[in-house]
Amino acid sequence: MAVSLDALSSASELDELRDLVRKVVAKHLPLGEMRHADPASARLAGWDALAELGLLGIAVPERYGGSGAGLAEQAIVCEELARELAATPFLATACLAAEALLASGDDEANAELLPRLVAGQLTATLAEGAARAEPRAQSWVITGDFHHVPDGADAQVVLLSAETDGGPTLYAVSGHEGVHRERLSTLDGTRGLANLRLVSAAGRQIGGVGAAGPALARVRLRATALLAVEQAVLAEHCVTLTRQYLLDRRQFGRQIGAFQALKHRLADAAVRAELCTGSAWYAIRQLAGDAADAEFAVTVAAAACGEAAVQNAAEMIQLHGGIGYTWEHFAHLYLRRAKANQYLFGTPSAHRNRLGTAVAENRSTATETVSVVTQGGSPALDDLHRWLADNVTDEVIGDHAAPPPGAKYSPVRQGWYRRLGEAGWATPTWPTEYGGRGLGRDEGGAAVEELRRRGVDRPEEDFVGVWLAGPTILQWGSDEQRDTYLPPLARGEHRWCQLFSEPGAGSDLASLSTSAVRIDDDRWLVNGQKIWSSFANTADFGLLMARTDPTLPKHGGITYFLLDMRSPGVEVRPLRQMTGDAEFNEVFLTDVVVPDSARLGPLNGGWKVGISTLMQERNSLTGPPVVGPGVADQLIGEAVASGAWQDADVRDRLQHMLVDERALQSASFRASVAANRDPGAIDSIRKLVSADLHERAGRIRVDLRPELTIGWAADAEMPAGTRSFLEMKKYCIAGGTSEIQRNIIAERVLGLPREADPDRNKPFNQRISR
């Protein structure tokens, strides 16, 4: 889960740089040796090696002796130094002092100081505090106090901002006279801190008088992004180290990583690491490209990464047990570094407050939307915009705004879905010959999102058909099946339902007992019961999994069928949900005859077909990779309008939700543009986090206007906030429960042992748990 910046520089070049820094750290700055060394001397160990390889000046222009690389490369160096808690003044010298000099635009000072910093001959830092500078002869004298200055006790040059009659100005202090340094004992022993007191200390002016404010704001923003990268790799490395311990440690006769309680905790830590890594990556990407949302993205990363690093370090201690609580173990060092980092450039709470305020005030930086597709331009989306302008009428918009619940489509909607399907926009990722436009996943997702934004997309009742049945038939169907089922599905002529779950086979879907017995070469006789089938009461067809060979292990004797719901013997009974609606159904299949031509995929190979359907379901529940305003932004707007934003608890919950939602967007964005990424991993993470965000939204929305959501007129519709509250658990269950998603992440992404299943390899008719 390293910060891959493939979109900024050559992936191979970044990988080479990462390997180079990792080797230098392993040779000169190993964690095992650094922890026992003298703190001051330890911070200079390996400094010459970093200088010889040009790493100290990696982002310094070549004219000053640097490598002339960019922010992406500097982030890689920060990442690899942080992975092993390397105790160097790299942050202070290369990320603060050098950047402050460059931001000043003072070519004379840069030409004198930067080559020495790059060569490792000079260490420096940037101090922030309250100080005043007065002119004296050909110089300036500075008086003031600076607290918790990174490597301030040992830096040979201290850059600082001091007030003057012309405004805040940058100065360099290199002498000892008038400079009092207090080396502090620190929570994080790998990074030195000092308090500085200057009393009429001589300082050299750097840059123009009054120019320090904007220059240092840029430096601080860049340093905050780089520190987020450091926090992200700490969060990720804590997962890596803990995973190995859970695999190595054995108790009760097995690896402790097999225990679900530990698996779920590590899965949650892995999710946090993925989200904060995605947010750090996105922040670096946007900042390097000087994007409009760069400052907002950096603030999201600082909030997400600062929190996740501390949480994951604490979780590493917990999951290591007693050994993790010892001085000799390295776990506490990661906790110390992560916590100390939170206070360098603003706490997570401070960053969350900044984000929430920006959204509440509707600032442009908070409303910027960035898409994988639209960043590079999309002729297909341009075509969609033109098509919508020509085809969307007030009648279509009005019919979508007030659809008849649970009924078949109105004539207006039938006409609209037919036009949408004929143009290929209902199913844009499908091949053109089957009613699509042949777009890729990201571009197609952006097209669907645009239809949703306009309020003219296909309804929720079509979810199974468009997002599950269609892609599954495309992948597994014969040419005849594709020709038969796909075009009318694209035109909105048929609805589909999913017939997987049974009363005795929910999360353990492979235990299904609905049987399909051959009548002859052309027909099957199906008997059984299905449950939790959304919209089965209005469906024309169903995706059916049935057992065709009970002598095979439970995963091996299943076959997949496309069931005509109008067949004799199919009985659908609606189930009323806690909202009062009846989307769920139980379906009874009694001597239903299914033609063999409706069998999808190989005989007894239906489990693989079903898994592909479930993967489509998880992906489709989370939306396309877009970074921008989402549900949290909408809720903040509602909170401001209702006055609930003044409630500290509501504000805090919404700000946490805002950070998590933007971090999830960033992680999804990263997965879409990065090479060699496993889509299954990010889809499971997106499903888990999206479900959690949906639940939190339901809990918060009812609190925004409680006077309306707990009681309403007898003849009125249920308020949206009440419905949202009652539906909050919907996606924590639908499409695979959150607990199952944690199992998937732990076992398939992290590689922890699978849950014990005594029936896994037994013939189904000989299983133990019947």
Q: Residue ranges of each PLM-predicted region?
A:
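A generic, well-ordered mixed alpha/beta core segment in the N-terminal half of proteins
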Residues: 99, 103-125, 141-142, 147-150, ...
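A structural signal for short hydrophobic beta-strand segments in well-ordered beta-sheet cores
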Residues: 133-137, 514-517
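Alpha-helical interface subdomain recognition
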Residues: 1-84, 120, 220-454, 476, ...
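A short, charged helix-loop
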Residues: 192-222, 590-617
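Flexible, small-/acidic-enriched active-site or ligand-binding loops
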Residues: 148-151, 175-208, 566-595
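A short, Trp-centered hydrophobic/proline-enriched beta-strand micro-motif
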Residues: 119-129, 160, 492-500, 545
